[in-house]
């Protein structure tokens, strides 16, 4: 019965918003926080339902103008990263890596988190995932970026630092 009520609730939410023609960054973010986030929080172990919810969100966003999408890229960063995690947990490597690459494409940069996130353990041996992690390191591993920068002296004394 609970599942039926959730499905009915989601259908109601998605039908109302999908018909909306005046999308802006605020309406996308409000939709995400009211229609996506509660489902994820309540059903965080139901990977199929989570994927379905995220895919509906992405489907709706296909009709949103690019200018609006750029203003709320965090929604897509979170969505694609979490889709990658769900797909990995469900042992669907190709789909997981595809979603992970999309997260990076939209601006995901938390290299340290991706490196230790156990949800991604099933794809760590995938060559595409490893290449994506290398690309991510270039923008998200701040120690690595600092060490590569001109003038960085690894042997410099740090005694005077607080």
Describe the residue ranges of each PLM region.
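Structural signature of alpha-solenoid helical repeat junctions
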Residues: 26-27, 49, 68-75, 110-112
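Pro/Ala/Gly-rich low-complexity, hydrophilic intrinsically disordered segments
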Residues: 129-159
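Flexible helix-coil transition and linker loops at the boundaries of alpha-helical arrays
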Residues: 20-23, 43, 59-73
